Amino acid sequence: MNQQYLSQMLEGLATSLQLTGASLLVGCILSLLMTVTLILRLPVIHWFTRGLITLFTGTPLLVQIFLVYYGPGQFDWIRESFLWTWLSQPWFCAMLALALNTAAYSTLLFKGAFNAIPAGQWEACRALGMDKIATLKVLLPYALRRAVPAYSNEVILVFKGTSLASTITIMDLMGYAQRINGQTLSL
């Protein structure tokens, strides 16, 4: 492999890892908030969270990336607002789409881990007279420890999903690989 191509591939790998890290950070924060809203069953927010989960788990990631990148530009009020400085950037749009996607899947994962907490721990919290917030403070770390092995799969899926960012002009690992393949006509 030529040194020039190696440096391009390393640059693409750095972009893919940056997208993965930022998406996981934003997605994890969102998913923890969404999980808490599902657990506490806050009336309106609960159904809004359910709708987001259904939307982002029921559509392909490529469609989500296209909608986040090409969709907002169709509205004048978005193009004229401060949001356009962010939504016109391909990197931000790819990160946002990946973050929302991983937030939806991670929320289901964290909710499942929370539901797997043994009933005895719930009863112990009730016996001690804890309210919902205090119970969450005690049981949420336990649930998160149970969710870590499954969350590692989500990390891999997000990294794989970054290859779709090359469809909206981001030169990540896949983008550089396709360019090199097109220039040299070899793998």
For the regions a language model picked out, list residue spans one by one.
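Transmembrane alpha-helices and adjacent helix-loop boundaries
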Residues: 1-187
